[in-house]
């Protein structure tokens, strides 16, 4: 009996680590998408080719609190992706365009599904 429980523990740990890796990949991939597509990508943002942003960062709402030439970097999009995947909703960055809203909705659905499937699988292994 003890060997069976130990075998299940090992399987469960592997499942949880794999699920965590999948979830982290989800966060990184969506961060890259947000970074690459917002206002035409990093090069277009640097050259101010597109005036209307797809995302409203808190720094844009309070320009007196940041440098006058502040632009979002990859870390800002990574934070957006992480908070969207954990809270399943916008936190301090608001989507302004339809594609941004749909992409954030897709990320939340993928994240929720991943977490639900990993938990369901772990519970099933323990039975």
Task: Set out the residue ranges of the language-model regions.
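Helix-boundary and loop/linker segments of multi-pass membrane transporters
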Residues: 6-12, 69-71, 93-96
